[in-house]
C-alpha cells in the first residue's frame, strides 16, 4: 500500500467536484485526489511530499492526498462511520478545515456538518454519534506546512451564508466547487491587497455583498 509520496507536480486534473494533480515520482506519474483546500494551498509549490490513503478496487486504485499526516488520520477516522465513503469524507474536508471539522463533531453541530455536499441530517448525526468521543487524540493546533490558505483570513471572517449563496449561484452556471472556491480566494486576496491591519481586513471581508463578490468571481472564472 502507498502511504507517502514525494515528487514533482506535473499536471492538474478536475472532474466535476473531484480534483487533484499528477505527481511524478521516480519516473512514474501518480494521479492523486486532494481537497480543494489542499489544492489551493499547494498551488505555488512544484516539489511536494504528500501523505496518501490508497483505496484498492477491482479495476485499479484511488489515491487520496493530504498535506499533513494528522489530516489523513482524520480522513481515515471519517470513513469508519457507517455510510461515509472516501468521497463524502473529502467533501467534509473541502468545506471544513481540520480544526473546524473536529469541533463541529465534538460540539454536535449538525447544521454545520450538513453544509457539505452529500451530507444529510442522518449522516451528520451518525458522524457525531460514532466519532464524538473518538477525536480527543487529534491535535487541534495542527497547521499545514504551506503558508497559503483557502481564504486570507479565517473562515469566520467571510460570511458563511454569503459563501453558500455564491456557491449555489455559480454551481447553477456549471462551475465546479473547486473552481468556485479558487475564484473566491482570488477575489478576496485582491480585495485585501491594500488593507493595513488585521482588523481592517476583517472589516473589508465582512463588507463584501453578494452582487460584488458574484460579479468579481464570475470575471475571475471567465479569464
Swiss-Prot record:
Keywords: Cytoplasm, DNA damage, DNA recombination, DNA repair, DNA-binding. Residues 158-223 are annotated as: Domain III. One of its GO terms (molecular function) is four-way junction DNA binding. InterPro entries: DNA_helicase_Holl-junc_RuvA_I, NA-bd_OB-fold, RuvA, RuvA_2-like. Residues 147-157 are annotated as: Flexible linker. GO terms for cellular component: cytoplasm; Holliday junction resolvase complex. It comes from the Bacteria. One of its GO terms (biological process) is DNA recombination. It is found in: Cytoplasm. Residues 68-146 are annotated as: Domain II. Residues 1-67 are annotated as: Domain I. Pfam families: HHH_5, RuvA_N. Homotetramer. Forms an RuvA(8)-RuvB(12)-Holliday junction (HJ) complex. HJ DNA is sandwiched between 2 RuvA tetramers; dsDNA enters through RuvA and exits via RuvB. An RuvB hexamer assembles on each DNA strand where it exits the tetramer. Each RuvB hexamer is contacted by two RuvA subunits (via domain III) on 2 adjacent RuvB subunits; this complex drives branch migration. In the full resolvosome a probable DNA-RuvA(4)-RuvB(12)-RuvC(2) complex forms which resolves the HJ. Belongs to the RuvA family. Has three domains with a flexible linker between the domains II and III and assumes an 'L' shape. Domain III is highly mobile and contacts RuvB. The RuvA-RuvB-RuvC complex processes Holliday junction (HJ) DNA during genetic recombination and DNA repair, while the RuvA-RuvB complex plays an important role in the rescue of blocked DNA replication forks via replication fork reversal (RFR). RuvA specifically binds to HJ cruciform DNA, conferring on it an open structure. The RuvB hexamer acts as an ATP-dependent pump, pulling dsDNA into and through the RuvAB complex. HJ branch migration allows RuvC to scan DNA until it finds its consensus sequence, where it cleaves and resolves the cruciform DNA. This is Holliday junction branch migration complex subunit RuvA.
Amino acid at each position: 500500500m502507498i502511504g507517502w509520496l514525494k515528487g514533482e507536480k506535473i499536471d492538474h486534473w478536475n472532474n466535476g467536484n473531484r480534483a487533484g494533480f499528477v505527481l511524478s515520482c521516480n519516473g512514474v506519474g501518480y494521479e492523486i485526489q486532494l481537497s480543494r483546500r489542499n489544492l489551493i494551498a499547494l498551488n505555488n509549490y512544484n516539489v511536494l511530499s504528500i501523505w496518501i490513503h490508497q483505496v484498492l478496487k477491482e479495476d485499479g486504485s484511488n489515491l487520496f492526498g493530504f498535506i499533513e499526516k494528522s489530516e489523513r488520520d482524520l480522513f481515515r477516522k471519517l470513513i469508519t462511520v457507517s455510510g461515509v465513503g472516501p468521497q463524502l469524507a473529502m467533501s467534509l474536508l473541502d468545506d471544513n478545515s481540520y480544526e473546524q471539522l473536529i469541533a463541529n463533531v465534538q460540539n454536535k453541530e449538525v447544521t454545520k456538518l450538513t453544509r457539505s455536499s452529500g451530507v444529510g441530517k442522518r449522516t451528520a448525526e451518525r458522524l457525531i454519534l460514532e466519532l464524538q468521543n473518538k477525536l480527543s487524540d487529534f491535535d487541534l493546533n495542527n497547521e499545514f506546512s504551506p503558508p497559503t490558505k483557502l481564504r486570507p483570513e479565517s473562515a469566520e471572517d467571510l460570511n458563511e451564508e454569503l459563501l453558500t449563496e455564491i456557491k449555489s449561484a455559480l454551481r447553477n452556471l456549471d462551475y465546479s466547487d473547486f473552481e468556485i472556491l479558487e475564484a473566491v480566494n482570488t477575489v478576496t486576496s485582491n480585495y485585501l491587497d491594500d488593507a493595513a491591519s488585521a482588523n481592517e481586513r476583517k472589516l473589508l471581508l465582512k463588507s463584501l455583498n453578494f452582487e460584488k463578490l458574484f460579479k468579481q468571481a464570475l470575471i475571475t472564472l471567465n479569464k
